[in-house]
Each structure stands twice: as structure tokens, then as C-alpha cells.
């Protein structure tokens, strides 16, 4: 509102009749395109080689705009980057914009993601470093550190899964942690899954009975020695991250496995591509609303079609039959 109007509004409030405005309020307005006219690489569907990123796509600024710039930049430079909804919040952001559009500046919130247990802050490098390396964004030395970290996490989890602790070894620690005592041997991974225990509580007990040697890089969760091919020790911050990752992956294994299964089902739908030039009016059985939405939005695959408002499970079944008949 104009400054004089703002002043009039404030002075109409009891007690503020003589107030002075130090700095008037303002609103930010900007033009934007219809993001549903972009594909998942942020390229215009009807103009090859034209990419859009940022607030012009209907998102808010800052992180949302920067994330789109990263994807559009890689793809416009000739690389290939496509992050799906189960791989990163960037994937959720872009998929929502190009599939559903938006009536107000889009903010990326965790509640928008179906696979939040997979999209954790602690595993961002495990999810995305491989994609970044293939896109040319990750240098070889950093990528090698990542692969070593990944190998050590997997090796440590395998090692701990083979260790069984007897009551006489574990019960003193369990009593100190007010955890139920053992009457027979228990896998160390099962102990880590107890709510009152974690990796650091039980790791000191492991070497006393372990016949499985620690990995070359990683020793007992606290020490590191040179790995294969005379590589230098892993930095301390990576060792700390390894411990955290081992603890999380063991403790929440059941929940993580459930979400991985759900994500696998989601990806099956994503891999069923819909040809760009389908005439939806010719597909018998589709409801009128579905035909109109599909014709306008032109989803790239069956998964994207399933997230369009107005496309029902019955419509998806008809599309699936159509694809199989082609």
C-alpha cells in the first residue's frame, strides 16, 4: 500500500494516533511462467534447449531457486541430472512444480515429501554424491573419500551383524543403561535397536568376542588405519559420520526397509514412460477430466500422471493397459 495509506491505517488504531513510521512496509511482486510447461529437467516442453530456474517457475527464492538453478544448469550445459522424489527434496520441489503447478510462491517443506525417512540430512552425500560425480560436479578425490566411507559403513554393519554377545559380557553395561538383561546370547545389532541403547554403548564390547576383523579403514568405531592401496587415514569428520550412519542404519533398519520398498514401487511407476505425443482423446475409458488434465500437462511417465489432481486409479489402470498394448 502507498505510504500515506499505511500511515492512515496505523493512526486509526487506539494509542497509535500520533505514531511515525520509520520504514514503510513493502511487498515483492514478480512475474512467473506456468511451470507445468516444463519437463523434469526444467526444459521448456515446446522449445528445446530453453531452461527455466528460480522464482520465474513459481517458487520462492533462496534455497528453492538455487536448487532449480543447479539442475537446470547441469542439464543446459549438456549433462544429465534428474533427481526423483525418493532421492532428494530437489526432486520433490521440481516434481511438484512441473506436475501440479502453483498458485502462490512454492516453499519446500518436509511435509511435502512422501519418503522423509530416506531424505535425511545425515545421508545427503550417500544419496546424491554418485549423481553429482556423474554430472561432473564432484572431483575425483572427494568421490574416492565418498566411496571409502560407503564401503566402510557397509563393512561395519556386516561385521556387527555377525557378533553375538553373551550375558556375562553384556549384562553389566545393560544394567548401567537400565536395559533388560540377557538370559542368552544376543546379536549386537539387536541390542543397538533397543531404544535406550546405541552404537557407542555396545561397540566397546564387540572386539572381546568378535572373530570378524574390522574393515581395513575402520577399527572398532574409534580408530582408523591406512586402507587398501596405501591410502591415507580417513579424516576424523568422516569417521564420526560413519559411526552416526552405522547407528542410524541399524537402529531404524525396519522403518528404512519399509520406505525403501515403497520407493521401489514408486520407481516402477516412474519407469513406465508415457510417449510425448499420446492422443489421450483416443484412449477409451478415460474420464473427461483425466483426458483434459493429461492432454494439458503431458506427464513424462505413469508415476507423474498419478500425482495429477483429477487422474484416478481407474484412469491409471487404463493407461497401463494402453501402454502394454502398444
List the predicted regions and their residue ranges.
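A glycine-rich dinucleotide-binding beta-alpha-beta segment and adjacent secondary-structure elements
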Residues: 2-57, 85-95, 240-293, 298
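Acidic/polar loop patches that form or flank catalytic/metal-binding clefts of enzymes
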Residues: 18-22, 79-84, 139-143
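Glycine-rich phosphate/pyrophosphate-binding beta-alpha loops
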Residues: 55-62, 114-116
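Internal hydrophobic alpha-helix adjacent to the cofactor/substrate pocket in enzyme cavities
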Residues: 65-83
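Buried hydrophobic packing segments
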Residues: 72-76, 128, 319
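Mobile "lid/hinge" segments at catalytic clefts and subdomain interfaces of large enzymes
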Residues: 94, 102, 106-134, 139-143
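Extended, charge-enriched "interface" segments that sit outside catalytic cores
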Residues: 112, 129-134, 138-211, 215-218, ...
Amino acid at each position: 500500500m502507498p505510504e500515506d495509506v499505511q500511515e492512515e491505517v496505523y493512526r486509526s488504531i487506539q494509542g497509535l494516533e500520533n505514531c511515525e513510521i520509520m520504514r514503510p512496509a513493502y511487498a515483492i511482486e514478480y512475474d512467473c511462467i506456468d511451470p507445468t510447461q516444463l519437463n523434469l529437467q526444467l526444459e521448456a516442453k515446446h522449445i528445446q534447449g530453453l531452461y527455466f530456474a528460480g522464482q520465474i517457475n513459481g517458487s520462492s527464492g533462496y534455497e528453492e531457486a538455487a536448487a532449480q538453478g543447479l539442475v537446470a544448469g547441469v542439464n543446459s550445459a549438456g549433462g544429465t541430472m534428474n533427481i526423483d522424489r525418493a532421492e532428494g527434496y530437489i526432486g520433490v520441489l521440481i516434481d511438484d512444480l512441473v506436475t501440479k503447478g502453483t498458485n502462490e510462491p512454492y516453499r519446500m517443506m518436509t511435509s511435502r515429501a512422501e519418503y522423509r525417512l530416506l531424505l535425511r540430512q545425515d545421508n545427503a552425500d550417500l544419496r546424491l554424491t554418485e549423481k553429482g560425480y556423474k554430472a561432473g560436479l564432484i572431483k575425483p578425490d572427494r568421490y574416492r573419500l565418498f566411496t571409502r566411507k560407503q564401503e566402510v559403513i557397509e563393512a561395519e554393519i556386516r561385521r556387527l551383524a555377525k557378533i553375538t554377545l553373551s550375558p556375562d559380557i553384556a549384562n553389566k553395561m545393560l544394567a548401567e543403561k537400565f536395559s533388560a538383561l540377557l538370559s542368552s546370547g544376543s546379536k549386537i545389532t539387536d541390542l543397538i535397536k533397543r531404544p535406550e541403547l546405541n552404537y557407542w554403548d555396545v561397540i566397546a564390547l564387540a572386539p572381546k568376542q568378535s572373530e570378524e576383523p574390522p574393515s581395513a579403514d575402520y577399527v572398532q568405531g574409534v580408530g582408523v588405519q591406512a586402507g587398501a592401496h596405501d591410502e591415507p587415514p580417513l579424516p576424523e569428520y568422516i569417521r564420526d559420520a560413519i559411526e552416526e550412519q552405522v547407528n542410524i542404519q541399524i537402529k531404524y533398519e525396519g522403518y528404512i526397509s519399509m520406505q525403501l520398498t515403497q520407493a521401489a514401487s514408486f520407481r516402477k511407476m516412474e519407469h513406465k514412460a508415457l510417449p510425448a505425443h499420446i492422443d489421450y482423446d483416443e484412449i477409451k475409458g478415460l474420464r473427461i477430466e483425466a483426458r483434459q488434465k493429461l492432454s494439458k500437462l503431458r506427464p513424462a511417465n505413469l508415476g507423474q500422471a498419478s500425482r495429477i489432481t483429477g487422474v484416478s486409479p481407474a484412469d491409471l489402470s487404463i493407461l497401463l493397459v494402453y501402454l502394454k498394448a502398444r
